[in-house]
Amino acid sequence: DLNHNFLVNELGDNYHSTVETAKSLLADFPDKIHLPVDLAANIEDNRVDLLIDDLPVEAPLIDLGIQSTIAVSTAIKSAGTIILNGPAGVFELPDFSLGTIEILNACAESDAYAVMGGGHTATLVTKYGLASKMGHVSTGGGASLDYIAGRTLPGIASLEASAKQFAVEITKPVDPQ
């Protein structure tokens, strides 16, 4: 299956562990994880929304379906905090940008604190004039998620190490002679 092969190629050696982690999280938090009910396939350069039950298909699945987009947008509107990392679909193709644009609009309309992460997301939020309605916009997608998860970021670690190393020299009184 085309979409399965795409995931295997993207995740490489991490494919099986990622699938197992996803299954475990879904089992542990079934009321917190919303899976799509439909997806948009690119069939002969046309958007065709397909129910999950109609899968698999030998066509790229490159956006959320309309029903899933509505469900995600509704969930966003009642959220207290939103962390979004990356577009929902292949937004460069107008027919497959619907999920992304609607989700960004829902984030902007929500009263929640919204963190937008990733270069594509930051570009789109700016393009559609939504940046001022978000709590934070960062071009660092994976780095933003790592920071939120409490992981050490190499750049921050280097700055902290540098501050420790040079703090003594910076704060020493200078001898006027």
Predicted regions: what they are:
Residues D1-Q177:
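Active-site loop-to-helix "anion-binding N-cap" substructures in soluble metabolic enzymes
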